[in-house]
Amino acid sequence: MNEPLYRLVYISRNEIKGDDATVLGEIDQILASSRIKNPIANISGALMFNAGCFAQVLEGPHDDIQNCFERIQCDPRHSHVVVLSFEPTAKREFSNWSMAYLGADSTASAKFGGIMHESGFDAELLKGERIFDLLKEHLLEAESNSL
């Protein structure tokens, strides 16, 4: 029996300190760990990062998403973790990725930085759907460009 799918969208502040190489090394560790653990937990998703913030979409069974998110909340590389949405979903939008990534040099990340600046990191002004749509649009574009 298939468990119902859920989608969680959150943002957090980046607490990784150091030069660009140090920060990118930490991001690589996050991605490597996620790409190993997420398929085992039946989680797919996407991470977006710029120097100041993370945004992430996680898709999968409710309890698995919740367990993964609890680990994220305890990770010292994140602070001010805010859930923008956590809802049932009919299908996965990031099924091809255990953890897709849009880095600080991407167009999406620049737009994300603008959204975060515009909102003043105020969760009341941010919408999970806006972050989700931004990630989806740019990952699908990147995927089609790589074909």
Label for each model-derived stretch:
Residues 1-147:
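Charge-rich, low-complexity N-terminal segments
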